[in-house]
């Protein structure tokens, strides 16, 4: 997206903390978001929770961390936007749930939508990312197109991560 389009684009941020009341069911969460956000699609929400194997009668307070992450992604991706910002959506989630969440996100977004994911799980995102941006001490440390990095520099995003943040590109174990 060009910078002028980005200024006009509708942006959605998914925070690391859930904002659901303990009494809510998965269905209640959808209704709550539908009442507060006119860009929220209940149809898309139901598709997302189905993809993520959540049922509408599940209680929010009883969800595991992986299921809670799925619910947060479902409400975020059920909103219409040109730019989605996901803050650590895979943090603390087991491997199978991470795979399911990433698959659901990729199936849910339109090709003309921009998805920005902040994460320390670089290896998980490398296989689906077009570009990588690295911040260090609040400053842009590096940015690259993932495929160009592989072809031109014969490096992975993980290699570049290690160079920027330590270990000189060497694996520790």
What are these regions (language model features)?
Residues 125-127:
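A short, surface-exposed alpha-helical micro-motif characterized by mixed small hydrophobic
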Residues 84-88, 93:
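Catalytic Walker B motif of ABC-type/P-loop ATPase nucleotide-binding domains
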Residues 98-111:
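Helical segment within the ABC ATPase nucleotide-binding domain
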């Amino acid at each position: 997206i060009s910078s002028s389009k980005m200024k006009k684009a509708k942006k959605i941020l998914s925070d690391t903390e859930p904002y659901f009341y303990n009494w809510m069911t998965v269905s209640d969460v959808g209704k709550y978001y539908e009442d507060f956000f006119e860009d929220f699609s209940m149809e898309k929400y139901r598709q997302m929770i189905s993809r993520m194997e959540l049922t509408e009668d599940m209680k929010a307070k009883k969800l595991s961390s992986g299921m809670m992450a799925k619910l947060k992604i479902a409400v975020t991706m059920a909103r219409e936007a040109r730019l989605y910002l996901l803050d650590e959506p895979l943090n603390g989630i087991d491997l199978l749930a991470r795979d399911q969440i990433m698959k659901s996100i990729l199936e849910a977004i339109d090709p003309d939508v921009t998805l920005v994911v902040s994460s320390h799980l670089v290896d998980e995102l490398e296989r689906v990312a077009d570009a990588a941006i690295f911040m260090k001490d609040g400053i842009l440390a590096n940015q690259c197109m993932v495929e160009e990095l592989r072809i031109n520099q014969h490096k992975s995003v993980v290699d570049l991560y290690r160079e920027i943040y330590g270990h000189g590109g060497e694996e520790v174990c």
